[in-house]
Amino acid sequence: MMSFSVLQVKRLQLELITPAKPTLQETKFLSDIDDQEGLRFQVPVIMCYKDNPSLNKNCNPVKVIREALSRALVYYYPLAGRLKEGPNRKLMVDCNGEGILFVEASADVTLEQLGDKILPPCPLLEEFLFNFPGSDGIIGCPLLLVQVTCLTCGGFILALRVNHTMCDAPGLLLFLTAIAEMARGAHAPSILPVWERELLFSRDPPRITCVHHEYEDVIDHSDGSYASSNQSNMVQRSFYFGAKEMRVLRKQIPPHVISTCSTFDLITACLSKCRTLALKINPKQAVRVSCVVNARGKHHNVRLPLGYYGNAFACPAAFSKAEPLCKNPLGYALELVKKAKATMNEEYLRSVADLLVLRGRPQYSSTGSYLIVSDNTRAGFGDVNFGWGQPVFAGPAKALDLISFYVQHNNNTEDGILVPMCLPSSAMERFQQELESITPEPKEDICNNLRSTSQ
């Protein structure tokens, strides 16, 4: 295994990729779900591909993807624009066709040498997705940054950073799929994009009809250690949940409960309890874990067009004081998670939009007693094929402070779920201990599948 302290990534000139054809010059409003304060950040995604000469012999992935991006932007032209604020900080996109940032790069390393360094939390992310000065803002900045890095083995890494106000994971997947289809020769996306953000505007008059713990102000009984932890003291580690880990967790749940819970529910309950113990949260402190729930599809009765690529989710929160969460069996936390997710329907989403307008777009809590979890295991990033087959890995590149993204991962023996976490260093050690305690056998399986990197 090579030393990554000497990894050489050479980048060429930064480019602006514009739509391949003239597009409408107009201003489009974002929805009231899109422009909430809690989504005004950028999300990094990494996608890693092997060389596949049988599928794309003598083709240059940089050239193919660059051209496909330009053609896809004809259909997704708002992504080539810039955000601006209107009255009351309402976000809108100026569809001016200025383009997205694109950089071509090469690295003197093979995909095999990189090994699990491509997995979240990716310690080499800054090499494969360079943070160009002035590129990471929200207002007036490019909405996408894409870096394609060619490797010596013939494979490549596509890393991108997207402004979350423009799309969620299913929306980003629609755009990536369109690029991939263009790269493979299609003349148009198989699913045409739909803007129609007015579908998720607040009602007239707006009215809050549901309880939204995720936006509530709560009394902070903590000692402030989480908030005072600077970035140099924060670490990220990924925890692997395979068949053995899940079997041990299920044994702790009553049969009538386990029959109606998902793998996501069980992992989230486990994280909620272990994290609360690790942070030594005051017993009286309210603890909230928000589950990102996609509004698309028939299950939640939210009628949106197939090509809608805006944010269409809510984050209902499991709510409890720290003391019962820590002292009760795991089934207690599991019931809270299931109850929170069950509140999600069209009325809940409409109530969120109304709350955001009535209360001036409140931010999600920034205390350590709050966590957001997002299940990306079925997001579909692993199906994006630019002509080199499916990626070895594709998904969010790391956790984001109070946000954890679950991703699918095969550890060479089985498919499991990788969960990156971000915590102060001292709390991370305790979190690992609590996790090993709650899944007492086999300890070695969990320990062998831990990855950590300081951020």
From Swiss-Prot:
Its EC number is 2.3.1.-. One of its GO terms (biological process) is fruit ripening, climacteric. The active site is at H164, N385. InterPro entries: CAT-like_dom_sf, Plant_acyltransferase. Keywords: Transferase. It holds the Pfam family Transferase. One of its GO terms (molecular function) is acyltransferase activity. Expressed at very low levels in the skin of ripe fruit. The fruit of cv. Royal Gala exhibits a high ester accumulation, whereas the cv. Granny Smith contains low ester levels; this influences strongly the ripe apple fruit aroma. PANTHER family: ACYL TRANSFERASE 4, OS05G0315700 PROTEIN. This is Alcohol acyl transferase 1 allele GSb. It comes from Malus domestica (Apple). The gene is AAT1GSB.
